[in-house]
Amino acid sequence: MTTFPMPDSIINGKATTPAVLPDRNTHQGKEPIPHPPPPEVAKEEMMAAVRTILLNVGEDPDREGLLKTPKRVAEAMQFLTSGYSQSLETLVNGAIFDEGHDEMVLVRDINFFSLCEHHMLPFIGKAHVAYIPNQRVIGLSKLARVVEMYARRLQVQERLTRQVAEAIETVLDPKGVAVVMEATHMCMVMRGVQKPGSWTVTSSMLGVFREDQKTREEFLNLIRHQPNF
């Protein structure tokens, strides 16, 4: 876990400890549940919860159209949160190669979907992922799979963007990583402010992308450019 220096704060006459940044696999510095229930047990419990929701919105869960709804919703939730059962090491699976390449590698327009952790409504968009190798490169499909793994969890877009960047930095130790994500959030479209057409853009720049303006501008220009195919 990474700590960053900050002035001591005084609460009830005592100095607090330095703030701790959450690891990419944790939330607010707390470890995830170490032993989630087996998939079939989790599925049964989710089905019961969905049935309770149906009853409390005024529906009859025993009518024909809703008989299989708890099962369908539980299976959908297991799929949409399948990133919790994946690990970075297993996902990469050794697909790192010493190619001696030291110029930017960019995979853009990676479609993704995730669930907002506040309302459990979808947000959908595109990710643009780039890195400058330190001689080693990773299989291109793995960049998309890293996005997918972290997106298939309950998320906020800001954290998702940072997690993807830090994961690539961890497995490659490159000269720099840049990630930009653009998404529309159903929690802003279907409820609350109800603003269809609004997009949220987040970025995470590490290494030379953060330190060197020309490198950062090259990346931003490349993701603005529309391909001719």
From Swiss-Prot:
<feature type="region of interest" description="Disordered">
    <location>
        <begin position="1"/>
        <end position="40"/>
    </location>
</feature>
<feature type="compositionally biased region" description="Basic and acidic residues">
    <location>
        <begin position="24"/>
        <end position="33"/>
    </location>
</feature>
<comment type="subunit">
    <text>Toroid-shaped homodecamer, composed of two pentamers of five dimers.</text>
</comment>
<dbReference type="Pfam" id="PF01227">
    <property type="entry name" value="GTP_cyclohydroI"/>
</dbReference>
<dbReference type="InterPro" id="IPR020602">
    <property type="entry name" value="GTP_CycHdrlase_I_dom"/>
</dbReference>
<dbReference type="InterPro" id="IPR001474">
    <property type="entry name" value="GTP_CycHdrlase_I"/>
</dbReference>
<dbReference type="GO" id="GO:0006730">
    <property type="term" value="P:one-carbon metabolic process"/>
</dbReference>
<keyword id="KW-0547">Nucleotide-binding</keyword>
<dbReference type="GO" id="GO:0005525">
    <property type="term" value="F:GTP binding"/>
</dbReference>
<keyword id="KW-0342">GTP-binding</keyword>
<feature type="binding site">
    <location>
        <position position="116"/>
    </location>
    <ligand>
        <name>Zn(2+)</name>
    </ligand>
</feature>
<comment type="similarity">
    <text>Belongs to the GTP cyclohydrolase I family.</text>
</comment>
<keyword id="KW-0554">One-carbon metabolism</keyword>
<dbReference type="GO" id="GO:0005737">
    <property type="term" value="C:cytoplasm"/>
</dbReference>
<keyword id="KW-0479">Metal-binding</keyword>
<dbReference type="GO" id="GO:0003934">
    <property type="term" value="F:GTP cyclohydrolase I activity"/>
</dbReference>
<keyword id="KW-0862">Zinc</keyword>
<dbReference type="GO" id="GO:0008270">
    <property type="term" value="F:zinc ion binding"/>
</dbReference>
<comment type="pathway">
    <text>Cofactor biosynthesis; 7,8-dihydroneopterin triphosphate biosynthesis; 7,8-dihydroneopterin triphosphate from GTP: step 1/1.</text>
</comment>
<keyword id="KW-0378">Hydrolase</keyword>
<dbReference type="GO" id="GO:0046654">
    <property type="term" value="P:tetrahydrofolate biosynthetic process"/>
</dbReference>
<protein>
    <recommendedName>
        <fullName>GTP cyclohydrolase 1</fullName>
        <ecNumber>3.5.4.16</ecNumber>
    </recommendedName>
</protein>
<dbReference type="GO" id="GO:0006729">
    <property type="term" value="P:tetrahydrobiopterin biosynthetic process"/>
</dbReference>
<dbReference type="InterPro" id="IPR043133">
    <property type="entry name" value="GTP-CH-I_C/QueF"/>
</dbReference>
<feature type="binding site">
    <location>
        <position position="187"/>
    </location>
    <ligand>
        <name>Zn(2+)</name>
    </ligand>
</feature>
<feature type="binding site">
    <location>
        <position position="119"/>
    </location>
    <ligand>
        <name>Zn(2+)</name>
    </ligand>
</feature>
<dbReference type="InterPro" id="IPR043134">
    <property type="entry name" value="GTP-CH-I_N"/>
</dbReference>
<dbReference type="InterPro" id="IPR018234">
    <property type="entry name" value="GTP_CycHdrlase_I_CS"/>
</dbReference>
